[in-house]
Structures are given as structure tokens and as C-alpha cells.
Amino acid sequence: MILLAFSGELFKRINTSPIVHVERRTNPTTTVTVTTKPSPTPISPNQCNTNKIQCCNSVQSSDAPLLTGLLGLLGIVLQGVIPIGVTCSPISVIGIGGNSCSAQTVCCENNTFNGVIAIGCTPINIDL
């Protein structure tokens, strides 16, 4: 379970697919459903610098309502619509034991937000 805070209220993330269902944790219960645009065309791993490879629970468009709120809370202003990785962890070396990704393997341009988000993510066509 992933908890997100918006304007001091807690929300519980129900799943990690690109379609995100968020449930408000205060009464009365409010449900928000967000759908996103398809991800960019996958690239091969050798097209990505290894320190940019991430395993993200989902990749969503920066204009998705859930992400616009989160980006605002983090003080991030983006130009244009950009694919954003959500709840990411780095993958250091492909093929070495312990580096598995059961979610979405992506190559991201900006990974400086402690795994909460990663900016400019493109799917990598590989099974880890």
C-alpha cells in the first residue's frame, strides 16, 4: 500500500497499474480514477545510461490529475506533457542477481526525487 498526502489529507493508492485508483482516507469517502496516455515506444537497454535505469510501479503522463497535484506539492514545474515514473527504484547493473523488476523498467532523464517520481521516462524493452 502506498500513502500519498495532498493538502494535509492522506490518500491510499489501491493499485500500481497505469490506471490509478485512489481512495480518500477521511470521511466521507471520495474516489478518484485517473487514466493515462500510452507510454512512449520502448528503447533497448544500450540506449540508456545505466545510472538512469529505474524500476517504476507505473509511468504516467505529467498532465494526469494525480501527478499534477503531486508535482505541485514537490514544487516541480514542467514544460509540456512528459512521462513520469511513479514510485521508482534504481537498477544498477542489468543481469546481476538481485536486480529484478516486476513492474515497469524505464530509462529516466531526472531521478533526483528519492524514488517518489522520475521525470522523462521511456520504457526499456527488456525482461529483468
From Swiss-Prot:
Keywords: Cell wall, Disulfide bond, Glycoprotein, Secreted, Signal. It is found in: Secreted; Secreted, Cell wall. GO terms for molecular function: structural constituent of cell wall. InterPro entries: Hydrophobin (IPR001338), Hydrophobin_CS (IPR019778). Its main location: secreted. Glycans are attached at residue 110. GO terms for cellular component: extracellular region; fungal-type cell wall. Pfam families: Hydrophobin (PF01185). Disulfide bonds join 48-107, 55-101, 56-88, 108-121. Belongs to the fungal hydrophobin family. Self-assembles to form functional amyloid fibrils called rodlets. Self-assembly into fibrillar rodlets occurs spontaneously at hydrophobic:hydrophilic interfaces and the rodlets further associate laterally to form amphipathic monolayers. Aerial growth, conidiation, and dispersal of filamentous fungi in the environment rely upon a capability of their secreting small amphipathic proteins called hydrophobins (HPBs) with low sequence identity. Class I can self-assemble into an outermost layer of rodlet bundles on aerial cell surfaces, conferring cellular hydrophobicity that supports fungal growth, development and dispersal; whereas Class II form highly ordered films at water-air interfaces through intermolecular interactions but contribute nothing to the rodlet structure. This is Class I hydrophobin 19. The lineage of its organism: Eukaryota, Fungi, Dikarya, Basidiomycota, Agaricomycotina.
